[in-house]
């Protein structure tokens, strides 16, 4: 209903226009992620709101589309979870209490595509982007997270942004992950690796990824 990956590949909603790209487009190799023993296309995430895509009733999603996710997410703002995690990634480590983590290879997630971090994503650079949101203690800190994210700040007191080909997560409790919007299991220990140029898609000749 939000078609994040189609948005990243700039595939039009029009069947006729998409058919034209399928016939006249060009091949583009895209990285994918390996999550322990399985794989995912563009996002692996856990924490607040990440179970909304598979917990929201399908009938509601069919009727309301992206709005269904927004409404379901709003109901949960007052009860943000907290996870104490250890994270290792290329050239860095992090340990602390967080409420949301996303490993991404997309310019659009949950229908959102206005942050500078996502705007500059390269789908076949061998790297995924990581956004880790530290748990706010009050409403002002939560507002600062949103403000700095929209400004494109890479890191700060509220969240961490990093690019890496490898991520390792350790938590004292089982974590419910979502992979591409579907339930991905609840391991305490997770290793994510980027698999370079693993899938080929047909995209429009004018896609900005082809200009780099």
Predicted regions and their residues:
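Oxyanion-binding "anion nests"
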Residues: 78-127
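Short Pro/Gly-enriched beta-strand edge/turn motifs at strand-loop
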Residues: 13-16, 66-71, 148-150, 173-174
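ATP/nucleoside-binding phosphotransfer catalytic cores, i.e., glycine-rich phosphate-binding loops
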Residues: 89-90, 95, 120-125, 132-212
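Short solvent-exposed loop/turn micro-motifs enriched in small/polar/acidic residues
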Residues: 25-27, 78-80, 94, 114, ...
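Gly/Ser/Thr-rich active-site loops/lids in small-molecule metabolic enzymes
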Residues: 60-67, 108-109, 119-137
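Small-residue-rich beta-alpha loop regions that form the catalytic core of phosphotransfer
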Residues: 1-67
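Short hydrophobic-aromatic micro-motifs
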Residues: 38-45, 50-51, 94-105, 109-111, ...
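Histidine-centered catalytic micro-motifs used for acid/base chemistry in nuclease
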Residues: 63-84
């Amino acid at each position: 209903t939000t078609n994040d990956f189609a948005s990243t590949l700039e595939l039009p909603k029009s069947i006729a226009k998409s058919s034209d790209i399928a016939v006249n487009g060009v091949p583009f190799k895209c990285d994918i992620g390996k999550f322990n023993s399985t794989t995912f296309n563009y996002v692996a995430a856990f924490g607040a709101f990440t179970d909304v895509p598979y917990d929201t009733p399908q009938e509601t999603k069919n009727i309301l589309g992206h709005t269904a996710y927004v409404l379901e997410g709003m109901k949960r703002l007052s009860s943000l979870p907290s996870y104490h995690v250890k994270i290792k990634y290329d050239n860095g480590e992090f340990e602390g209490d967080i409420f949301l983590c996303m490993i991404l290879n997309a310019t659009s997630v949950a229908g959102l595509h206005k942050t500078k971090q996502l705007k500059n994503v390269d789908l076949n650079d061998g790297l995924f982007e990581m956004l880790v949101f530290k748990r706010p203690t009050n409403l002002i800190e939560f507002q600062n997270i949103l403000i700095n994210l929209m400004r494109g700040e890479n890191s700060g007191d509220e969240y961490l942004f990093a690019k890496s080909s490898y991520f390792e997560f350790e938590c004292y409790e089982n974590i419910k992950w979502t992979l591409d919007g579907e339930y991905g299991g609840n391991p305490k220990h997770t290793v994510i690796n980027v698999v370079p140029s693993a899938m080929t898609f047909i995209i429009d000749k004018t896609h900005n990824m082809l200009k780099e």
